[in-house]
Amino acid sequence: MERVQPLEENVGNAARPRFERNKLLLVASVIQGLGLLLCFTYICLHFSALQVSHRYPRIQSIKVQFTEYKKEKGFILTSQKEDEIMKVQNNSVIINCDGFYLISLKGYFSQEVNISLHYQKDEEPLFQLKKVRSVNSLMVASLTYKDKVYLNVTTDNTSLDDFHVNGGELILIHQNPGEFCVL
């Protein structure tokens, strides 16, 4: 026959599985708590990311017209919109951002003219035409902060009383927003 163990020995052996069961429950609770913490962190990060607006920089652009001619200043550049980022100062378009610019120049003149488009005083012009009555040009130029784009129109005719232009416009559009800008 088999020998039966006394009750005291059974109690001693039974406590060990109960301790391992408590240890297993503790480990499972810790894992659940960490999972809950990770879920809570993910939800908080998700909602905080929704509150941050992803704003792209406004594209630098301007459309100016030149229709009025003054003997001292040449053609006067005027912008039709007040809310444009780029501005006209001292008859020049001020460049605020480094990068490539798409430049369009159009106009029909009443006389033969010499036209040049400059960006710095002592540099070669971006664009130059001699003895023309109209211009319709499109170009890309690399401009930097503090450059000033201005138009120089001259004529050999001494009578400037009837000197005018039809449809004179200059358009500049920055092609790579996000470059160095000072606004």
UniProtKB/Swiss-Prot annotation:
The chain crosses the membrane at residues 24-50. InterPro entries: TNF_CS (IPR021184), TNF_dom (IPR006052), TNFSF4 (IPR042338), Tumour_necrosis_fac-like_dom (IPR008983). GO terms for biological process: acute inflammatory response; cellular response to lipopolysaccharide; cellular response to prostaglandin E stimulus; defense response to nematode; immune response; inflammatory response; memory T cell activation; negative regulation of DNA-binding transcription factor activity. Keywords: Cytokine, Disulfide bond, Glycoprotein, Membrane, Signal-anchor, Systemic lupus erythematosus, Transmembrane, Transmembrane helix. GO terms for cellular component: cell surface; extracellular space; plasma membrane. It is found in: Membrane. Its main location: membrane. Residues 1-23 are cytoplasmic. GO terms for molecular function: cytokine activity; signaling receptor binding; tumor necrosis factor receptor binding; tumor necrosis factor receptor superfamily binding. Disulfide bonds join 97-181. Residues 51-173 form the THD domain. Coiled coil: none annotated. Induction: By HTLV-1 transactivator p40-Tax. Homotrimer. Belongs to the tumor necrosis factor family. Cytokine that binds to TNFRSF4. Co-stimulates T-cell proliferation and cytokine production. It is linked to Systemic lupus erythematosus: A chronic, relapsing, inflammatory, and often febrile multisystemic disorder of connective tissue, characterized principally by involvement of the skin, joints, kidneys and serosal membranes. It is of unknown etiology, but is thought to represent a failure of the regulatory mechanisms of the autoimmune system. The disease is marked by a wide range of system dysfunctions, an elevated erythrocyte sedimentation rate, and the formation of LE cells in the blood or bone marrow. This is Tumor necrosis factor ligand superfamily member 4. The gene is TNFSF4.
